Amino acid sequence: MKIVRNVEQGSWDWMRLRAGKVCGSELKYLITDKLAVRGWKTDMPNSYLYRKLDEKWIGGPREAFAGNRQTDQGTLSEPVARKYFASLLDTDIETVGGIESDDGRCWVSPDGLVNSQTGLEIKCPNGEKFIGWLLNGPHVPPEHILQVQFGLYISGWPSWWFLAYCKSYPHLAVPVEHNPTIAATIKEALYGFNDRFDEAWKILCEKNGGPPEPPQKKEPTQERPLFSWDQGAVNESDDSSQGIIP
């Protein structure tokens, strides 16, 4: 794997680097909340495949996510939370652009690194959601299990921290280890995705008479889209009861 430094998360260069790659926050489009690989006869994985093909073709995202009330809160609170947890863990936390897999087909964007060997996933939810996490913890909330385990899968590191912060409340800090069962599911999902991606890319290039022209660098539009892939909800009735090995 390759740690990408000197690139700010959320910048256009960052968006370009992760374009066309499977990202940790997007794994839900390939794997259900019950931690099963989604069938390719359903719309969700196919729509995700088309989106990633489009990103690679044009060299970046089609549109930029401008944020919403929840993500704005998280963005504003994250630096405060990072300083808080640096003090709690008694260590320096390095911010990086992301981590790219060895084959260059996957990308994770940790919220920090500890000693370049442990990743951090920091969440700063509103009070209502945070209380639920505290009362049902200490463990990684089901909706964030895949993202954390994907970081472990791509990096190959033995541990990752899930850290949740909400001002005036006690913190939630969960050390996470590699889960081989989830890793096997991720591997299966990526194999199916990459196989279909390669076949579709070959067809697109044949129809085009060759690969696309190299993209020109440009700034994305700042209008908020009607739907964001990273922030859009996946509506499924049952939450996964499968936990994380602490």
Question: Which residues make up each language-model segment?
Answer:
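Polar/charged alpha-helical tracts
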Residues: D13-R16, Y29, V37, S109, ...
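Charged, glycine-rich intrinsically disordered N-terminal tails and low-complexity linkers that flank
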Residues: M1-L76, P211-P246
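Polyanionic, low-complexity intrinsically disordered segments
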Residues: T185, G192-R224
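Intrinsically disordered, low-complexity boundary segments flanking structured domains
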Residues: M1, V80-K83, S159-L163
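Acidic-basic catalytic patches of nuclease active cores, encompassing PD-(D/E)XK
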Residues: T71-I93
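Nucleic-acid nuclease catalytic cores
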Residues: L89-P110, V114-W201
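Short, isolated positions within intrinsically disordered regulatory regions of eukaryotic proteins
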Residues: R16-R18, M44, P61, D111, ...
